[in-house]
Amino acid sequence: MRLVLLGPPGSGKGTQAAQMKETLQIPHISTGDLLRSEVVAGTPLGLQAKQVMAQGDLVSDAILIGMLESRLSHTDVVKGFILDGYPRNLSQAAALDGLLAKLGHPLNAVVQLEVPTDVLVERIAGRAQAEGREDDTPDAVRKRLQVYNDSTAPVIGFYQQRGILLRVDGVGRLDEVSQRIVVALGC
């Protein structure tokens, strides 16, 4: 099962990816974690990314797709993977699609975790308050969610056109949402 988890900040993507890793017995690939590990390992792509980040810029899609190509060549992904945090825009979705076609392993499904904005704001602002972070005010969270929605809406359409988008209600207990994902995937 080759799967992407999509959802706005606070939707529970990382939490559900960790749960699905156990349920489906396939690796969870977080692009953020992948980027950090490549930088720490000092790989050529990691060194490029480190230089870009040191200048305060965003890591290019070409570097990210290169890191993903390297990661997807490992033997632990033979039975599949769960990708979280990528793609974030249409250009990345097209690049991922091209990479997976080249590898002969297209995606089986893209799960969109759907959570109402008010619930997301409550989750993120509550988490920020618990962690003592003052930057995640309700207004700041709403702005982040709008940026996410603007960039990700075309990605959702991209996968919907391919017939692999599954919309799952992301509200509820961890086990309830996990069960909805398993049912949607037909596992």
UniProtKB/Swiss-Prot annotation:
CDD domains from the UniProt entry: ADK
Query: Where in the cell?
Result: Cytoplasm
Pathway it works in: Purine metabolism; AMP biosynthesis via salvage pathway; AMP from ADP: step 1/1
Region entry NMP, spans: 30-59
- Please give the catalytic activity noted in the UniProt record: AMP + ATP = 2 ADP
Gene3D superfamilies associated with the record: P-loop containing nucleotide triphosphate hydrolases
Q: Name one GO molecular function term.
A: adenylate kinase activity
The yes or no answer to whether the keyword Lipid biosynthesis is present is no
Q: Where is this region: LID?
A: 126-136
Domain of life the protein comes from:
Bacteria
The enzyme's E.C. designation? 2.7.4.3
Which residues are recorded as binding AMP?
A: 31, 36, 57-59, 85-88, 92, 133, 144
Question: What cystine linkages occur within this chain?
Answer: none
Q: Which UniProt keywords apply?
A: ATP-binding, Cytoplasm, Kinase, Nucleotide biosynthesis, Nucleotide-binding, Transferase
Q: Which positions bind ATP?
A: 10-15, 127, 172
How is this protein organized at the quaternary level? Monomer.
Which purpose does this protein serve, as stated in its record? Catalyzes the reversible transfer of the terminal phosphate group between ATP and AMP. Plays an important role in cellular energy homeostasis and in adenine nucleotide metabolism.
The name this protein carries in UniProt is: Adenylate kinase
Organism (species): Xylella fastidiosa (strain 9a5c)
Classification lineage: Bacteria, Pseudomonadati, Pseudomonadota, Gammaproteobacteria, Lysobacterales
